[in-house]
UniProtKB/Swiss-Prot annotation:
Family designation: Belongs to the universal ribosomal protein uL6 family.
Other facts noted in the record for this chain: Present with 5700 molecules/cell in log phase SD medium.
Protein name in UniProt: Large ribosomal subunit protein uL6m
Subunit organization: Component of the mitochondrial large ribosomal subunit (mt-LSU). Mature yeast 74S mitochondrial ribosomes consist of a small (37S) and a large (54S) subunit. The 37S small subunit contains a 15S ribosomal RNA (15S mt-rRNA) and 34 different proteins. The 54S large subunit contains a 21S rRNA (21S mt-rRNA) and 46 different proteins.
GO cellular component, one term: mitochondrial inner membrane
Location(s) in or outside the cell: Mitochondrion
Protein encoded by which gene: MRPL6
């Protein structure tokens, strides 16, 4: 590994540990708990291994979410001030520091998810391009120029709305699930660089290319 690569890695780990050390603020309507897994497992990556032995659960008005975490992560609750600190056993260990910021971000996303929810907005750009809900909102029919019927079943925990034929709103507690479903719908027609037709997610933009003239 070169000096520059080591430098970039150390900066990335430092930033992640900075994120990990930030407190999480929770409202009285949110409950965060950590419990031992009944069936812990070992995950190996290269020469390192992690014992996934705990489950963090976040409950709120909009639902309940959980994330499985390694044994070296802990939660320090400060109920008086309504905050939680995520800590690790050894903040000097690069693998623990890397997971520190990642898990803290996941928990924060879950807290937002069970209180406010997460959104993804899809825009359909192109003549006749649109989305339509069928089967009482359980199926998204996508029309993007294909002659055959295309679409996806709406996963459990996801709500889809169509404020306009060319717009789709995906809502859910789990941010990863919301973005994954949006990405799957986008695959039916990713934005193309010549006319700009396609399915755009959130603030996505593309740079149009000039057509090659033979």
């Amino acid at each position: 590994m070169s000096f520059i690569q080591r430098r970039l890695l150390s900066q990335t780990l430092f930033l992640r540990s900075q994120v990990g050390s930030l407190p999480l603020y929770i409202s009285p309507e949110v409950q965060v708990s950590i419990n031992a897994l009944s069936m812990p497992r070992i995950i190996r990556k290269g020469r390192t291994s992690m014992n996934i032995s705990q489950n963090i659960t976040v409950k709120g008005p909009k639902g309940e979410l959980s994330v499985e975490v390694p044994d070296f992560l802990h939660l320090d609750k400060d109920e008086k001030h309504g905050k939680i600190n995520v800590t690790v056993q050894n903040s000097e260990d690069k693998h623990q520091r890397s997971m520190w910021g990642t898990v803290r971000s996941l928990i924060n996303n879950h807290i937002i998810g069970v209180t406010e929810g997460h959104l993804a907005v899809l825009r359909f750009v192109g003549t006749g391009y649109r989305a339509q809900l069928e089967n009482d909102g359980k199926f998204v029919n996508v029309k993007v120029g294909a002659s055959i019927k295309q679409g996806l079943d709406v996963p459990e925990g996801i709500v889809v709305k169509t404020p306009a034929p060319t717009s789709l709103i995906i809502e859910g507690c789990n941010k990863q699930q919301v973005l994954l479903f949006a990405a799957k719908l986008r695959k039916f027609h990713p934005p193309e660089p010549y006319k700009g037709k396609g399915i755009y997610v959130n603030d996505e933009t593309i740079k149009l290319k000039d057509k090659k003239i033979k």
